[in-house]
Amino acid sequence: MSDQRTIEDAVVATIKLHADFDDTNCFAYDGRALGKGLPRLVRVSYASHRRQSLTLQVDRRIWSFNVDVLVPWRGQLAEMDERVGTETQKVIDTLAKYPRLNGTADVQRTDMTVSNTPDVLLERRGTYRGRRHVLDVLEVYDPQRAE
């Protein structure tokens, strides 16, 4: 069964590989990038997980991650919201297209909780504004399948 860091890294790697992001603007939680004046960034951070035994040997774990999409606070509010929406849609489309996170061990699917009104983020450092979505990653571990 994978650990939190493995799944988190797989989410970041999938976004980098398929959603037009790179090492400078897509990362596991690290607040240092906020002060660098980047034109956009994606921050993935662990939120929680739930574990359930399906049988004596088979476990199901649901990992939850916050996926924050941020852009600098510049210009008009409507234009900035449009930029946030565009960048967010890239991430949503990528995770929908690659629900198994490029074949990361035991990941069955991912589900992005998308609402019309995601949490709005107001980051003080670097004056960024963005949206937070919750990504659930379903992992089923069966030791007989792993062999």
Regions picked out by a protein language model, each given a short descriptive name:
Residues P39-R43:
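A short glycine-rich, His/Asp/Glu-containing loop-to-beta-strand
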